[in-house]
Design a protein with these regions (language model features):
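Extended amphipathic alpha-helical segments enriched in small hydrophobics
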Residues: 69-104
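Extended glycan-interaction surfaces of carbohydrate-active proteins
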Residues: 1-70, 96-149
């Protein structure tokens, strides 16, 4: 999925932002591969939201700034990209992102496995998780508990 003119430069590391072309992708096979990576716990999937860096990358570190934590603004954009193609996958991303935001104390970014808050706590863009919860088919999840695993 991560290829093209930057494959020999900064594009060598598989990152979540490199999957953002899904917002405008018209190749269904390619889109399906991206959605699968977002949910795969060996790729970008996590109980507290999608990882910023693919888990198989040597630089992946779930607690290191842009090396693997969940960033709510990227998770939000991925939900917007996935929703028209796969509502079930989008709902799964919403659930994990909301779980992470809640567990983190609405942090700037958080560990994708534990939801431990990183950076500024609270931070305004974590509020995007509340927007996702409100827009989801389950509403704001009613009385259902939020659990990172």
């Amino acid at each position: 999925v991560d290829a093209g003119p930057t494959a020999d430069g900064s594009g060598r590391v598989r990152t979540l932002d490199a999957l953002l072309p899904l917002l405008v992708e018209d190749d269904e096979r390619r889109a399906d591969r991206v959605v699968a990576q977002l949910l795969d716990p060996t790729a970008h999937g996590g109980p507290a939201g999608p990882t910023g860096v693919h888990r198989a990358e040597p630089v992946f570190d779930p607690d290191a700034y842009w090396r693997g934590p969940v960033w709510p603004q990227l998770a939000y954009l991925m939900v917007q990209a996935v929703a028209p193609r796969s509502p079930g996958a989008a709902e799964a991303l919403v659930r994990t992102t909301v779980a992470g935001a809640w567990a983190s104390g609405m942090a700037e970014y958080w560990n994708p496995d534990t939801g431990a808050g990183l950076g500024a706590i609270p931070q305004s863009w974590a509020g995007l998780a509340l927007v996702l919860a409100r827009q989801s088919t389950g509403g704001a999840f009613g009385d259902q508990p939020v659990d990172c695993g």
